Amino acid sequence: MSRFFANGSESESESSEEEIQATNFNKASAFQFSDDEEEVKRVVRSTKEKRYENLTSIIKTIRNHKKIKDIPNTLSSFEDLTRAYQKALPVISKEENGITPRFYIRCLAELEDFINEVWEDREGRKNLSKNNSKSLGTLRQKVRKYIKDFEDDLSRFREAPDQESEAEDEVVALESDGGDAGDDSDAGVKPTEAAPKAVKSAPAKAAPADDDDSDDSIDWDSDSESETESSDDENQYQNMRERFLKRTTEKEEKDDDKRKDKRKEQKTKIRKRAEDDEDGEWETVVKGHVVEKPKMFEKDAEIDVPLVLAKLLEIMSARGKKRTDRRLQIDLLFELRDISDQHNLGTAVSVKIHFNIISAIYDYNQKISEPMKLEHWALLLEVMQSMMKLLLANADIIMSESVAEEHEEYATSPFYVRGCPLAAVERLDDEFVKLLKECDPHSNDYVSRLKDEVNVVKTIELVLQYFERSGTNNERCRIYLRKIEHLYYKFDPEVLKKKRGELPATTSTSVDVMDKLCKFIYAKDDTDRIRTRAILAHIYHHAMHDNWFQARDLVLMSHLQDNIDAADPATRILYNRMMANLGLCAFRQGNVKDAHHCLVDLMVTGKPKELLAQGLLPQRQHERSAEQEKIEKQRQMPFHMHINLELLECVYLVSAMLLEIPYIAAHEFDARRRMISKTFYQQLRSSERQSLVGPPESMREHVVAAAKAMRCGNWQACANFIVNKKMNTKVWDLFYESDRVREMLTKFIKEESLRTYLFTYSNVYTSISIPSLAQMYELPVPKVHSIISKMIINEELMASLDDPSETVGMHRSEPSRLQALAMQFVDKVTNLVDVNEKVFDMKQGNFFQRGNMGNRGDRGYNRNQNNQGGNWLGQRRDRNNRNRNQRGHHKNNQDRQQQQQQQVQTIDEE
């Protein structure tokens, strides 16, 4: 029997229902339904219900995947969720006034928390499979990018995550039912507007409490029904559409009642929890037996210095043991400090407790390679500064690691406390660097951590003041080096203003501070490492502020390049950074050759990123082990200290272009021509091998295109490739006073293009006008005259200057292109003949033939034959040498004749 319609009246008795079924059976038999139609329940749902049900099913799938940490499927489900939400947007805009449903925001928040939890679990991440690890990175990026549009909703949700909307109640009920197929289809998220309607219509549809009628019979309207029933139907169904809609059965209504009861219980619990929170704070009970916090002192104990020190020794004796609660240890030390301050036990005792708190915070993190927690970092900064302020305020407290524990004095002045604030601040500085390395350099977290550098430098300054008052030279050198390492890479614009006279000479700049600190280390340090690092930092700081000559002199006088190979890796990294910055300084000052020499060792290896400790290149198989990679990552520099690698490479390639292109033009036919820059030469050759070259896009392509233009002497095209909007944005605008650098570059391009032009086309001209060259290259006539004179003096250009006519006369002493190629061909043929002769000698040998080994009488004959005609190889070599000498003699005669002709012309002119 078809169950297409449910019974409309639940108040009828069983007997009347059977009569109606009997009377209606014959009429209903006229309608024949297929078996498929009999098994299907007709459900009419709105678009909002469909969209919301799709969203909730995907959210449930995501939660299941999260429980088993199935990250690839979580990623695919998240992509499905975003697509489903995009489809539901029109419905949300229409029904919810554009407000994102709370259950969707809850899903995003839970997903973000799940990703952060998995990402922070380093040990767990290492054990992930390759597919899971890759999917985790992709999912993290996509979620972080996606939730940017929901930041306000997420922040509001996180402020009150326990509040639930009506739509979210449906989701909770759906998940609490156990996940039936029927429940999934009927218990989806319903529209918020439909919920009140369902509540209002419930009394009309609800049956009495003792009504147990079945809902499985078919209610067909017949003529035999009473008028009361028909009138009830008319009141119950306002239109024909409602008459044929699915009606809820008793079982479904019971399920709905259960869900409503559960929701009421949940809301009641939340309300009670909020009321309890208003009464007072609650503590989370840890699973297992509760460990009572140990009492500090007895109730009636007299608290004095020996008792506090004994308690301090008792707390610190558990340091480093296996089952020590390190968090509890820190709390006890803070409590002991408060007790000491309350009973006025003296500043020395307080300093001692402060130092032990610092040690306990350092001990909290057992893995030295990992950074400490942010809460401990903030606590450490606060305690460290508090301790140093106490030491500076009380000059009679002497804190040193040379003080033995039995010689500590807390009763009478001067007070002696065992401890080393220098070691504490050095560890503090190292922890700060670890925190920076751990953060994503492009996130706000990195900026937040970088703001802590102010407090770190302030703490170092406090320690520096303390050791300047009472400290050894070695301790002062160590703390000076820490301050130098926070100062040397920072640019101070006041230095250049002071150079230009815009500031008074008495103004103290960072260069003056560096001079003071470094000179003390040069004079007082007895360890090579501190002095070497101070020199390197000093050179770096000078180079950053364009003090080229001071930086160069320091490099030459210190002989660092001779001893740097024996230094530790951190010092070698600092040396590489210094050379890179020195090369940039030389380039800014117009010393192109020096800039190239400084950068060539870094760039020729192809690994400047690794040499400057700014990242690791993808490794080949078994190139380095996991332990080596871990050590190298620890040596990396923080992101804010990086040198722009693209800027470095551009400066190197431009310097190489300005040196290499004129050299190539001058030695075009020289077979033994050497390469000034191997990297630039390879870039040039690879570009020439390409059959089709498009317009330049990258920085390297711009430099190569400029080099090709310079080879033709076209300085304008060369300058346009080097100095343009794209290159300015990528490279030149990164320089301080970038306009001056661009002007300097254009000037050098003009001069080197002129030199290249003269080298390339000197065999074409008999004479050339200097004013014409000056006009062509937009250079002053004296500058052109100076360039040509220098080329003639260095014997690079065979020409003579005629000052009255302002012309350059070419001597044409160099061979033409055909002659140069012919001479190269002759040299190569001669080399080939020599090689063949050597091979022939090796095959024949210089011993007598095997057939005449026993005939001693023939030895004289063979010797005579060798002397007469057998030595034809030697004769041929002699003949070649004579021909060579004759050619050289002929050339000398030609040179002599040309000189004589010039002398005759000079005499005639006089």
Curated annotation (Swiss-Prot):
GO biological process, alphabetically ordered: formation of cytoplasmic translation initiation complex
One Pfam family here: PCI
Subcellular location: Cytoplasm
UniProt keywords, alphabetically: Cytoplasm, Initiation factor, Phosphoprotein, Protein biosynthesis
InterPro entries for the chain: EIF3C, EIF3C_N_dom, PCI_dom, WH_DNA-bd_sf
GO CC terms: eukaryotic 43S preinitiation complex; eukaryotic 48S preinitiation complex; eukaryotic translation initiation factor 3 complex
RNA-binding in keyword set: no
Main location: cytoplasm
Residue span(s) of domain PCI: 639-815
Biased composition (Acidic residues): 11-20, 162-186, 209-235
GO MF entry, a single one: translation initiation factor activity
Bias kind Low complexity: ranges: 193-207, 862-874, 895-910
Spans traversing the lipid bilayer: none
UniProt region (Disordered), positions on chain: 1-21, 157-281, 847-910
Subunit comment: Component of the eukaryotic translation initiation factor 3 (eIF-3) complex. The eIF-3 complex interacts with pix.
PANTHER family per the UniProt record, alphabetical: EUKARYOTIC TRANSLATION INITATION FACTOR 3, SUBUNIT 8 EIF3S8 -RELATED (PTHR13937), EUKARYOTIC TRANSLATION INITIATION FACTOR 3 SUBUNIT C-RELATED (PTHR13937:SF0)
Similarity field: Belongs to the eIF-3 subunit C family.
Described function: Component of the eukaryotic translation initiation factor 3 (eIF-3) complex, which is involved in protein synthesis of a specialized repertoire of mRNAs and, together with other initiation factors, stimulates binding of mRNA and methionyl-tRNAi to the 40S ribosome. The eIF-3 complex specifically targets and initiates translation of a subset of mRNAs involved in cell proliferation.
Full protein name: Eukaryotic translation initiation factor 3 subunit C
Species whose genome carries this gene: Drosophila sechellia
